[in-house]
């Protein structure tokens, strides 16, 4: 079975002429994910291209990364617009029992705990303020936004691919 990879960022551009790339992070562990010596992979159309971080610095809302052996803009130009991933085996941080990686949550089927109604699947997680918000894609309806609160998200079963919720009254419009 091939190893699982998780997205940690998106390469949006090059920076300068010395092979730096500009990355928008999609991980909460930027210092760990982008530190010198970390093995990552660029998701290219023909597969994953392995890279090793040789330098990292923050610049405005971006992270500027340089990769070993790729010290010229021409070496990294083809990475623009592609996702940056990390192998599951490279993730060495320990999560608490009630903490999850975004990549583990995205794609879960969201089910009403009380009656088994399926609302759809988590398509993304946004961070608008004090707590994360799950964006649930619903067929033929507008997206459902659920705050990541213990009063709303009742149970997460990563193995089964399901999250059980109790949607507060008034959060869902009657769109029938």
Curated annotation (Swiss-Prot):
It comes from Latilactobacillus sakei subsp. sakei (strain 23K) (Lactobacillus sakei subsp. sakei). Pfam families: PRC (PF05239), RimM (PF01782). One of its GO terms (molecular function) is ribosome binding. Keywords: Chaperone, Cytoplasm, Ribosome biogenesis, rRNA processing. NCBIfam families: 16S_RimM. This is Ribosome maturation factor RimM. Belongs to the RimM family. GO terms for cellular component: cytoplasm; ribosome. It comes from the Bacteria. Binds ribosomal protein uS19. An accessory protein needed during the final step in the assembly of 30S ribosomal subunit, possibly for assembly of the head region. Essential for efficient processing of 16S rRNA. May be needed both before and after RbfA during the maturation of 16S rRNA. It has affinity for free ribosomal 30S subunits but not for 70S ribosomes. The PRC barrel domain binds ribosomal protein uS19. It is found in: Cytoplasm. InterPro entries: PRC-brl_dom, PRC_barrel-like_sf, RimM, RimM_N, RimM_N_sf, Transl_B-barrel_sf. GO terms for biological process: ribosomal small subunit biogenesis; rRNA processing. Residues 97-171 form the PRC barrel domain.
């Amino acid at each position: 079975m091939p190893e699982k990879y998780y997205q940690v960022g998106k390469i949006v551009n090059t920076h300068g002429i010395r092979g730096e790339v500009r990355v928008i992070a999609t991980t909460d562990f930027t210092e760990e994910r982008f530190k010198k010596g970390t093995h990552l992979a660029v998701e290219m159309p023909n597969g994953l291209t392995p890279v090793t971080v040789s330098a990292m610095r923050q610049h405005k809302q971006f992270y500027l990364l340089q990769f070993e052996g790729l010290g010229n803009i021409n070496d990294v130009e083809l990475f623009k617009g592609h996702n940056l991933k990390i192998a599951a085996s490279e993730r060495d941080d320990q999560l608490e029992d009630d903490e999850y990686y975004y990549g583990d949550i995205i794609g879960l089927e969201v089910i009403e705990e009380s009656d088994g109604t399926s609302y759809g699947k988590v398509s993304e997680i946004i961070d608008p303020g004090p707590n994360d918000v799950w964006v649930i894609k619903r067929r033929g309806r507008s997206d459902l936004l659920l705050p990541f609160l213990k009063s709303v998200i009742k149970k997460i079963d990563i193995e089964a691919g399901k999250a059980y919720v109790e949607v507060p009254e008034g959060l869902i419009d009657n769109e029938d």
